[in-house]
Amino acid sequence: SERVRLQNSGDYDEIYIMLQDGTGQAVQLTSNSDSYKYSLLWSPDSKKILWSDRLFRLRYIDIDKKQIVEVAKGKAWEIRDYTWSPDSSWVAYSQQELNSINKIYVWSLADGKTIEVTDNWYSSYSPCFSTDGKYLFFVSDRDFNPVYSRTEFNHAYLAMSRIYLVTLTAEVKSPFEPKSDEVKIGTAIETSKGEKSDIEKASTPAKTAAEKVVVKIDEAGLRDRIVDLPIEVASYSSLTSVGDRLYYIRRNMAERQSSFKYYDLGKREEKDLGQITSYVISADQKKMLVAQRREFAIIDLPAAPIKIEEKLDLSGLEMWLDRQTEWAQIFNESWRQMRDFFYAPNMHGVNWEKVRAQYE
């Protein structure tokens, strides 16, 4: 029932939370910030907010304690790719190394331990925990199929990526292990007490994501448990796990178009869902907001190509504007961005404070 917002307070934005209906007073969580913040992300238990900043830090704040904890600090660049585990006890993120390769790490909130998931040989990114906490999905560039030019003695690597998963504990079996074809004789379909038979129990849906999940990670042999999904080489993004399904957007570089798909780990098959621009799955994992160009719709989680029948009517949206306040914010934000993002810290000798005063 709460929402988070960034509000300018001094030189940098601060994090506030407030009720969704706008009633009551907003609660300020951070103060005296020293850098730009990126991509605020609530934890699944709604007790923490994770973000990264211009100073290469990845941090979260405990809502109740109002305590900021540093998860990691980038070695070569900003950390812009991160996610929570379903039990809010781990953070997975990718970080650019000094050799320009992106590596995936997981960090434990319990003891502050950092574990390397991938190595320095292949760039890996877009980590995504499975909803049951057994796997970590990610994208990695491990295929080298050069395309040669007809006019130059040169080649380029256009399609290098696949989706991979790693089983987080040694006890969890890979979903791609050979299946046993042994037939077991179950009990009768109907029992005298009306209880479910063995056959019925086997077909009962798994526990919902709302039930408690505890994520455990065995560091020993972690990289040896990495396997690739049997899908084509392309560019992948927007990984989201729901039960046995992993939703993602694939871009085929040869065809220059994107397609929306999911892979079913139980059935070991990929399904095409058509073409969309982007999507977001609701917290209860029952609904999906999809965008097709400039049109939006809320639909049930799809299992077949998407056909938008009821589009969201956004014609009634209104925005309250204070033009003078908005113009002042635009001016101040432009000044701050030049100060913080200009490649030369000394601004080429220009007195930047004086420039601000000159135009205010």
Regions flagged by a language model, labelled:
Residues L6-Y16, G22, T30-K37, K47-I63, ...:
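A flexible loop/linker signature enriched in serine peptidases of the S9 family
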Residues S1-R3, S39-K48, Y82-W90, S126-Y135, ...:
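Blade-terminus and WD-like Trp-Asp/Gly-His loop motifs, strongest in beta-propeller folds
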Residues A26, V213-E232:
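A short helix->beta-strand "capping" segment at the edge of beta-propeller domains
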Residues M18, V91-S94, W107, N120, ...:
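Generic, well-ordered alpha-helical scaffold segments in large soluble proteins
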Residues Y16-M18, S203-L222:
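Blade/loop signatures of beta-propeller domains
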Residues A26-T30, Q67-A72, K113-V117, V227-L229, ...:
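A short beta-strand motif characteristic of beta-propeller blades
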Residues S149, D228, S238-S241, Y248-E360:
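Intrinsically disordered, Ser/Thr/Pro/Gly-rich linkers and terminal tails that flank
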Residues G22-G24, K65-Q67, D111-K113, A170, ...:
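Short coil turn/linker residues within repeat-based beta-strand modules
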